Amino acid sequence: MKRNNKSAIALIALSLLALSSGAAFAGHHWGNNDGMWQQGGSPLTTEQQATAQKIYDDYYTQTSALRQQLISKRYEYNALLTASSPDTAKINAVAKEMESLGQKLDEQRVKRDVAMAQAGIPRGAGVGYGGCGGYGGGYHRGGGHMGMGNW
């Protein structure tokens, strides 16, 4: 009985941690993985900088809920893996949900990249490539957004 109480308390603590800290990780200014900085291209004009900033701000606003959901699913996935008897079916279901969320974020990222190209902002000029490819510092994909002049 003591073990069940400890497991329940640990699960509640993990859930509270996931609910309270996820917003910080999904935040608009976390990290510099997908921020905007010059990478050897020609300098952007003031108009291009403003356009790029708006495109990035819109992208982060539009993907905020998706990024939060992905982080919550990662917490759930990790909790399922650390259970005393891991449920393979539940773990696989959560993994598929994470994959689906990742694909939705990829689609939004492509839309952002197309908007940047259509605005005449050269690839690599004023746009960071994301340290690990896209969604958030330690989460295998870039997600932090610091914006121009905010380093």
From Swiss-Prot:
InterPro entries: Metal_resist. Its main location: periplasm. GO terms for cellular component: periplasmic space. Residues 1-26 form the signal peptide. Keywords: Periplasm, Signal, Stress response, Zinc. The keyword Chloroplast does not apply. The keyword tRNA processing does not apply. Coiled coil: none annotated. It is found in: Periplasm. Belongs to the ZraP family. Part of the Zra signaling pathway, an envelope stress response (ESR) system composed of the periplasmic accessory protein ZraP, the histidine kinase ZraS and the transcriptional regulator ZraR. The ZraPSR system contributes to antibiotic resistance and is important for membrane integrity in the presence of membrane-targeting biocides. ZraP acts as a modulator which has both a regulatory and a chaperone function. The zinc-bound form of ZraP modulates the response of the ZraPSR system by inhibiting the expression of the zra genes, probably by interacting with ZraS. This is Signaling pathway modulator ZraP. It comes from Salmonella typhi.
